[in-house]
Amino acid sequence: MRLAFQLSYDGNQFRGSQLQPAYRTVEGELITACQRVQLFDDPCKAGFALAGRTDRGVHARGQVGAFSTPFPERAVEALNGQLSPDLWCNGFAEVPPSFHPRFDAISRTYRYFFADWPLDIRAMDQAAAALIGTHDFSRLARVREKSPIRTVKSARVFQDRGIPVFEVTAHTYLWHMVRCMAAALLLIGTHEREPELMERLLSGKCRRNPPAAPADGLVLWDVDCGVTFTPTEPDPRSRDWIGSARREAMVRERIIGLLDRSGVDRRGKEPGDDSGRDLL
């Protein structure tokens, strides 16, 4: 039987999601947990896959994974029983044998939690609206793919219990695309740039790209694969640190603390970095 799982993780202690020998990754932890309880031996033969890759330090609330196993009845309980406290399963569903979370994904939604306040939310939301539609995102990403053209379905900036949040939904993204968009919005929110900056970036009229915002504020919020998940029993170790009542305090502590330790100021720039001024 093929099963799909909705997964959450705190990305701080992972070297990204993709399997890498000698490093702790989300895929590595999941595969090891499955093999430990003999859900499968070979991840390739089991068709193990995730819906999307996340970089080092990026978190997830709604990542989707899938694999095939001859022991579906014990898969759900076994997974949460074997996983570490910073990685857990929120839901599961039986899916067709051909289901692949990456290729069957209809859309992926990210949220970026800003460690800066107050910000001009109205100006940021106005600028975010310019992202909607099909554009060349060369100036808002690090382009590795053949085409820099992507289509954004929705984009908005709002406050959630006092924390400024940028939410964007698209089918696929370029590398660092969301973090570069967040960095540009931050320049607008701090009044270092006008909302028209976003349109100038999309039209290619700016001389350089904005630097990518720190990874620690980024959350893979949801992946829509057209699957309805059955919620799992709450695991006592699981910490819905982005969705719980403690989220605000934890986001402030995690993100600001990490920025302070990394020498990045609260505008997401290295000390002395005037890259925001050089955009135009």
Swiss-Prot record:
E.C. code: 5.4.99.12
Reactions this protein catalyses: uridine(38/39/40) in tRNA = pseudouridine(38/39/40) in tRNA
Active site annotation, chain numbering: 55
UniProt keyword Hydrolase present: no
Domain of life: Archaea
Enzyme class (EC, first level): isomerase
An example Gene Ontology biological process: tRNA pseudouridine synthesis
Keyword Isomerase: yes
GO molecular function: RNA binding; tRNA pseudouridine(38-40) synthase activity
Segments passing through the bilayer: none
Alphabetical UniProt keywords: Isomerase, tRNA processing
Cross-referenced CDD domains: PseudoU_synth_EcTruA (cd02570)
Pfam families noted in UniProt: PseudoU_synth_1
Function comment: Formation of pseudouridine at positions 38, 39 and 40 in the anticodon stem and loop of transfer RNAs.
NCBIfam families according to UniProt: hisT_truA
Protein name: tRNA pseudouridine synthase A
Biological source species: Methanosphaerula palustris (strain ATCC BAA-1556 / DSM 19958 / E1-9c)
Gene from which the chain derives: truA
